[in-house]
Amino acid sequence: MATFAKPENALKRAEELITVGQKQEALQALHDLITSRRYRAWQKTLERIMFKYVELCVDMRRGRFAKDGLIQYRIVCQQVNINSLEEVIKHFMHLATERAELARNQAQALEEALDVEDLEADKRPEDLMLSYVSGEKGKDRSDRELVTPWFKFLWETYRTVLEILRNNSRLEALYAMTAHRAFQFCKQYKRTTEFRRLCEIIRNHLANLNKYRDQRDRPDLSAPESLQLYLDTRFEQLKVATELGLWQEAFRSIEDIYGLMCMVKKTPKASLMVVYYGKLTEIFWMSSNHLYHAYAWLKLFSLQKSFNKNLSQKDLQLIASSVVLAALSVPPYDQSYGASHLELENEKERSLRVANLIGFEVEPKAENRVALSRSSLLSELVSKGVMSCVTQEVKDLYHLLENEFLPLDLALKVQPVLSKISKLGGKLSSVSSVPEVQLSQYVPALEKLATLRLLQQVSQVYQTIQIDNISKMIPFFDFTVIEKISVDAVRRNFLAIKVDHMKGLSSLVNRVLRRKDSGIICLFLAESLSKARTMIYPPAKKAAKLGEALSNLAEIVEKEHKRLLARKSIIEKRKEEQERLLLEMERVEETKRRDVQKMTEEAEQKRIAAEYEQRRNQRILKEIEDRELEEAQALLHEAEKRSKRKKKPVLEGEKMTKKVIMELALNEQLRERQEMEKKLLKFAKSMDHLERAKREEAAPLIESAFKQRLAEEAALHEREQQQEIELSRQRHAGDLEEKRRLARMLENKRILQEKVVSSREAEFTRMKRERQERISQIIQSRKQEREARRKMIFFLRSEEERQKRLQEEEEARKREEAERRKKEEAERQAKLDEIAEKQRRRMLELEEKEKREREEILRKSTAVLPKPAEPPTLGRPAELGGAAPIPAAAATAPTPGPGKYVPKHLRTKMDGAGQAPPPETDKWGGGSKPDDRPSWRDERKPPSFGSGSRTSWPASRR
């Protein structure tokens, strides 16, 4: 490490090293001087040294050296002359930018220069080999070799300057200027990665500034000038992010602006808020978040209408139309339908966060938060009078989509309105943040909304509809796109649609009818099913309560016993579970106690280690202070030894602090410097008198020597002039002799020249004639090729048209055949339906007739005999038509009692007594034939269960 008595010596030494080409040694010498503790008092020489230092750092691309030097120089200049640091930093950035631009221009010039030896060759062999080996083009190689290192150094320069100026309240303007230049660098050269890092760096600087706001020399954000600088930086960051297409970084910049305003509790000016909401509209549109996009447009409209006095009526109409179209572009269903609870919570938090950004409340209150929705947005548009400012086309579109009920021709009426709206828009003359408004960007979203509205209205009118009819009613999209839109709407619970591609039908469900009338329909269905069950299974008569209780007593006792056993087992299981839980709780408590004990021991060990580390740090700091004090005292003693004064300052031992000793040493150095300047001034004065005396004595001697020198030089000039004239005469005579000698060959030279010229003219004429013949041949051949190609193209087009015509004829024939088959199938199905309907009516008539006959028979039988208590038990022979065996005791029974079985022979006796015997009924309730033997046809006939049953009979049975 070189030691210099004065800073000027170091600068002089560095210049000498630069002259001989040793720039590294010169940089190291200046670096040692700047980082030395001997030169901590600012002086003008240090500024010149820093200028030279940064020039060397830029020339050699030593960013680390530059950062160390600027940090040390900041320490020197912070309290004395901060403007010097500003000048050095500006010079540093200017040099880095200039060298980067120079390298870029050199790369472009190298790429555009014509540096080839053979103009007919495309590339040199070595260029081809290099391109095949490296795999990159010439411009890529030149950029990598020339431009990229300087761009890296320029980026490192910006980072270094921002790091140095981040906590300096006196250089806030320079910090903002550096940030703006870094943004422009990223924008000019499309450096997206560096832009993200730069935004993160600035964001961290603001966080640290807010965290350590009580430190000295920190910027005060409550000051209007500081706040304006920081806001301008954030808005420039927002603009560059949108121009680079970094929408996520642009949204983070919006959050940075909002966080900065919440930090200082102050709302920015209206001009800045216009830029804020203008960029918000772009961000939300690129993220396909139409709801927030519409709210941002509404805020922008309110600001422009309130604060922009130069806003023309046309511009206001365009902005209002954009607000209404953005609101209509919002999907009419809930996007979060069907999401999980965690997703709903996250969406709620995100919506509240975005609502704060759009509302821009620097002190948001929880009770004032309102969730954003499409319905509230549309009502707000009407209440704020936005609809009165829009164009007539937008009003018509709003009326069609929100108020009209046109289930068949809604899309057809919307289409011409959208075509007119797509042509509206243009540049705005008085809105700087939104220079241009194009309403055509909302047309796709509005077409989707018109499709949803049409499907919603059609579902309220029709249950099924043909897919072809839907495609005709919606001219915007193909049916595949319509199907995707419908699937999304069904998933969001907006529509209920089923599509059958085999039948070409679409089933629609009216969600309003299903919600309101579903309970009534279910009630009617339940009553009908209950009646049908009662007719099929009629309820039996209830027995006595005591008999029922006695008959079910054993079952009840068994059930009660099982229930008690189950309850006992449940109680036992609960006891075991309780014991297990108690054991588990004891084990958990023991584990917790051990963990707490372990944490206590670890905390004690950490406390002991921290105390030991603190004592060690204090000891190291004390040793450092003692060493610095000793160095200061040694410096003071050395200064006293150099001093010639007899009276020396008395050291007070431990009472003398380092600051006092440094002040004494600096005062001593200042006194020595002043004495040295006085001595130099006295010596210069004496040297001035001596020099003047010497010049007065030497003046006459110099004059006489000058006159003598003039005479000598005049004689010498005359002599040299005569010699030159003689030499010129000799050269002229020799030239004349040479001319006479060469004049004899002049005729031969002329003959040779004519011969060469004639031969070359003949050769040129021959080559010109051959070239004309070759060109005519080429023209003829190309003409023939074009003719052949034209004929081939005509033939191919004719063939394609013929094939296409044949294909269309074949498709038409197939289509006619399909329509004919469909028509025949429909006619055949109609005939079959008619035949089935006639059969059903005939069966209903037969069943109704049988029912009437059966009721008539039952009515007659109940009028003659009382109904038996128990149904008769019929054996297998009776079921097959044979007579049951008659017991002997029954023959002598005079009159059957009520509830007894009456055989056939007794019924004849009763008939003789004057009573009409009732017809015998089987277990199905049907009457038998006179001979009590049902035929084979009656045995095969299934029973009828009343009018509600429907029986299908074969055609042969009917």
UniProtKB/Swiss-Prot annotation:
The UniProt record lists the keyword Signal: no
Listed InterPro entries: EIF3A, eIF3a_PCI_TPR-like, PCI_dom
Residue stretches of biased makeup (Basic and acidic residues): 804-859, 929-942
Major subcellular location class: cytoplasm
Alphabetic keyword roster: Coiled coil, Cytoplasm, Initiation factor, Protein biosynthesis, RNA-binding
Composition-biased stretches (Low complexity): 877-894
Region span, Disordered: 804-958
Polar residues composition bias: residue spans: 946-958
One Gene Ontology term of the molecular function aspect: translation initiation factor activity
Annotated compartments: Cytoplasm
Residue stretches spanning the membrane: none
Domain PCI per the UniProt entry, residue ranges: 316-513
GO cellular-component term (any): eukaryotic translation initiation factor 3 complex, eIF3m
UniProt record, GO biological process: formation of cytoplasmic translation initiation complex; translation reinitiation
Ranges in coiled-coil conformation: 93-123, 548-696, 796-861
Function statement: RNA-binding component of the eukaryotic translation initiation factor 3 (eIF-3) complex, which is involved in protein synthesis of a specialized repertoire of mRNAs and, together with other initiation factors, stimulates binding of mRNA and methionyl-tRNAi to the 40S ribosome. The eIF-3 complex specifically targets and initiates translation of a subset of mRNAs involved in cell proliferation.
Subunit structure: Component of the eukaryotic translation initiation factor 3 (eIF-3) complex.
Family: Belongs to the eIF-3 subunit A family.
Protein name, as recorded: Eukaryotic translation initiation factor 3 subunit A
Source organism: Nicotiana tabacum (Common tobacco)
Gene: TIF3A1
